[in-house]
Amino acid sequence: MRPINILILSAGTRNKIVQYFKKTLGENGKVIATDMSTIAPAIYEADKYYIVPRITEPGYIDIILDICKKENISGVLSLIDPELSLLAENEEKFKNIGTTVIGSSYELCERALDKMQMFQWLRSHGYNCAKSYVDKNELNRLQLFLYF
């Protein structure tokens, strides 16, 4: 059976998440972590770690793809929101090397980053959620109405 190797991107201070994956995988795989900082404590919990550039740097995805190939990564996930969109946008590249992107579709990642767009989608699909406002004046008018 192929080992289940997981790559956790932008691990930062999320030690418990790295520990959880290590405990769950046990001897059946490894946890590899990345971060742009050598003082990100979670990378030191992993079986192996890589220091990588910022996600906005040119060639970032190619570096991550190289790590996936080198470490025989089964699944890759990020712990920061903007990187989720980046992974989803490049999902086919990961699939082509045998790595599964663990996350939502690009469209859903982008929607989740836009509070008003997410609010409108939730409402249009029948979900109850708190009212959201884009126009500060609209909110002020509502507050005045509620106080009088």
PLM features: residue spans?
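ATP-binding N-terminal substructure of ATP-dependent carboxylate-amine bond-forming enzymes
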Residues: 1-102
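Residues that form or immediately flank small-molecule/cofactor binding pockets and catalytic motifs
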Residues: 36, 54, 106, 134-137
